[in-house]
From Swiss-Prot:
EC number(s) given by UniProt: 3.6.1.9, 3.6.1.12, 3.6.1.-, 3.6.1.23
Subunit relationships: Monomer.
Keywords associated with the record: Hydrolase, Magnesium
Protein family according to the UniProt entry: Belongs to the Nudix hydrolase family. NudI subfamily.
Pfam families the UniProt entry points to: NUDIX
Chain location of the short sequence motif Nudix box per the record: 38-59
GO molecular function, a single term: dUTP diphosphatase activity
Keyword match Amino-acid biosynthesis: no
Annotated source species: Salmonella agona (strain SL483)
PROSITE patterns xrefs: NUDIX (PS51462), NUDIX_BOX (PS00893)
PANTHER family: GDP-MANNOSE MANNOSYL HYDROLASE, MUTT_NUDIX FAMILY PROTEIN
Ranges of residues in domain Nudix hydrolase: 1-141
UniProt-recorded name of the protein: Nucleoside triphosphatase NudI
């Protein structure tokens, strides 16, 4: 089984949290709402990976003004690729508290939508199990 280290930003701006809706045909949680994030590449430092993933998935305009390591956990997930292939992966999640200076988002094709959500409305979204666990651990659910 392949192992991946995943950097995952919990991004907040003025009391609202960023959720991204996964594309229906790919990823670990197709069609569900999630936090952004992705894999650390070989030779890449953790914060570099976090900033790269934010740029790739959310666009160049989103500015993270504060990044603080928060927690970690692991899991085994089945990832679905755009071509329909599936793979079981051992995931190590490194989760960061992040504050953005703005809300300028330009999502890539991994996502079909995004939303800035008040804490009391987070439970209204179809959150994937990993995001639900993270938000509950943070005391937001």
């Amino acid at each position: 089984m392949r192992q991946r280290t995943i950097v995952c930003p919990l991004i907040q701006n003025d009391g609202y949290y960023l959720l991204c809706k996964m594309a229906d045909n790919r990823g670990v949680f197709p069609g569900q709402w999630a936090l952004s994030g992705g894999g650390v590449e070989p030779g890449e430092r953790i914060e570099e990976a976090l900033r790269r993933e934010v740029r790739e998935e959310l666009g160049e305009q989103l500015i993270l003004s504060d990044i603080t390591p928060w927690t970690f956990r692991d899991d085994i997930r089945v990832k679905t690729y755009a071509d329909g292939r599936q793979e079981e992966i051992y995931m190590i999640y490194l989760i960061f508290d992040c504050v953005s200076a703005n809300r300028d988002i330009c999502i890539n094709d991994e996502f079909q939508d995004y939303a800035w959500v008040k804490p009391e409305e987070l439970a209204l979204y179809d959150l994937n199990v990993a995001t639900r666990h993270t938000l509950a651990l943070k005391g937001l659910l």
